Amino acid sequence: MKRRAYISEVPFDEAGSDDRNIYLTFDDGPNPHCTGQILDVLAEHRVPATFFVLGGHVKDHPDLVRRVAAEGHLVANHTMTHPDLTACDSEAIEREIKETNEAIVSACPQVAVQHIRRYGAWNADVLSRSMNAGLRPVHWSIDPRDWSRPGVDSIVDAVLAAARPGAIVLLHDGCPPDEIGNCKLTGLRDQTLSALLAIIPALHSRGFSLRSLPQ
């Protein structure tokens, strides 16, 4: 499949299986209609996670990024405007990476950005420029396609069926800037939120620990 043509080169598809750790990750935020509710659930269950934030959204909602960091979660780079980096020239790739890092650090000076993820599409140029910026490329191993709103049970079942030590779960706490006009913002990620309320205790009951990505 084209979007995974270079996935064997991405060093972080899973995060190791020595311990029974699973890593919840959230893309496309911060979003004032979603992120705070996700954070509330994570706080209730004392679960740390990793948030791959869009630089443009960070500029619009720096308070939410500060809350993410203050509550012990990892803040990571999801590019500035959500392009397919494999379709960008080298200058655009570097700009997307650099401006997002700058937006994050401007909002949260204490944050050291160490990870990047975008689209699941990678090529040699994107990988090298990400790593040259000091960022570790991250993919995922469980994708319940929560962004498509398939139903709460579908999201829960997809995660639990594929759960294994070291798994990286892809979820969403917002939507890309080019889709906001077509999104119903209120309740945008209500299925993700409801699924999370079931996923966390179910994984704990199976003996898994939930962590933010290793640094």
Curated annotation (Swiss-Prot):
GO terms for biological process: carbohydrate metabolic process. It is found in: Cytoplasm. Keywords: Cytoplasm, Hydrolase, Metal-binding, Nodulation, Plasmid. Its main location: cytoplasm. PROSITE patterns: NODB. One of its GO terms (cellular component) is cytoplasm. GO terms for molecular function: hydrolase activity, acting on carbon-nitrogen (but not peptide) bonds; metal ion binding. Signal peptide: none annotated. It is an enzyme of class 3 (hydrolase). The active site is at 27 (proton acceptor), 172 (proton donor). Its EC number is 3.5.1.-. A divalent metal cation binds at residues 78, 82. Belongs to the polysaccharide deacetylase family. NCBIfam families: nodulat_NodB. Is involved in generating a small heat-stable compound (Nod), an acylated oligomer of N-acetylglucosamine, that stimulates mitosis in various plant protoplasts. This is Chitooligosaccharide deacetylase. It comes from Rhizobium leguminosarum bv. trifolii. The gene is nodB.
